[in-house]
Amino acid sequence: MGRKGDLLALVDSAPGGLRTLQAALTTWSHRARIAEVHRRQDDAVGPGVRDPVPAVAVLPGAAAAHDPDDEDDEDRDDPVRPVAGADDEPAESLSTAYVVVALPDRWRVVGRGHLAVSDGRRSWAGTSTLVTERDSRRAAIGDAGAIGACLYPGAFLYRLDFTEPEPRDIEGRPCWYVAGHPRTGPAARQGPPARPDLRLQRELVGIDHEIWFDAATGVVLRHEGSIDGEPCSTTALTDLVFDEPVRADEFRPPPGAVVRSRHELLRDHLASMGIDPDTVDLDDPVQVRAALRQGE
C-alpha cells in the first residue's frame, strides 16, 4: 500500500488502542489570517452551498462565534476558550490547557478560568465555581475543543495532497511528519466524510498544513497551519503521558462548584433582559434565538 497509504489507514483508525492521555494543550492563532482562511474556504464552497465551517475568525480550539443558522449553537458548552470575533481582541492569541482523556467518553480540559469535563454520562462546562450541566446525549469528545480534533483526525488527510511521511519524534515519541495543501478538482471529494462533531477545519486551521502524527495511535501531536507562507495557527500536545491510570475524580466538576442546568442559566439570562422565560420554549433553538435577538 505504500507509506502514504499506511499513514492514511493509521489516521483513519485513530486513536487506535489508546486508553488514556494526559498532556498540555497549547494553541496559538493569528486572528486576521484565520479570518482569511475561512473567507477562502467559503469561496471554495461556492454560492448556495453551506460551508460546515463558520465563516468567522475562530481561534483554533475556540468555541465558534454565534451562527444564526446553526440549530445547535445555543447548546455549545465549550468554554475552554473565549469566542472569537470581537473587534477589541488582540491580533494574536496564545493559550495553554491541561488535558486528561479516558476514551471513549471521559475528558477534562482546564484552561485559564475555564473548564470542560465529562464522566461519560454527563458533561459540565464553566469555571471552578460555577458549571453548567448538560445531557450526555450531546456529550461527545468534540465538545472538549481542539483535543477532539487531535484524537480523531479522521478524514483530515483526505482533503490534502501531502508529502511522503517522514519519521520524526516529539518528546522522544516516534511520529510521522507530513506537509500538505488542499486537493483540487475531483480528488478533493475523495475519502470518507469527516466526523461532523469534531469540526476539523475549525480546530486545525490553515490553507497549508504541517502535521506530526503519533506513530502508534495516529493522533495529532502537533499541527501548524499557514496561509500564503505566513503562520496562522498552531496546536501542540506536550508533556505527554500515554495509557497511565487516571483517577475517577478527574472527570467530575470541581469540589464546591455550583452546578446549574443550561435551562436555569438561560432563564436567568432572559429574565435579566426583561423577557419572561415562560413565554419561550427553551428546547426550541429558533425561539431562543428570536428571544435573545429581541432582548438585544
Residue positions per predicted region:
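Short, hydrophobic/aromatic-rich segments at coil-to-beta transitions
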Residues: 17-24, 104-108, 172-179, 195-197, ...
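Short loop/turn motifs at secondary-structure junctions and domain boundaries
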Residues: 90-91, 158, 201-205
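Generic short beta-strand segments
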Residues: 24-31, 179-188
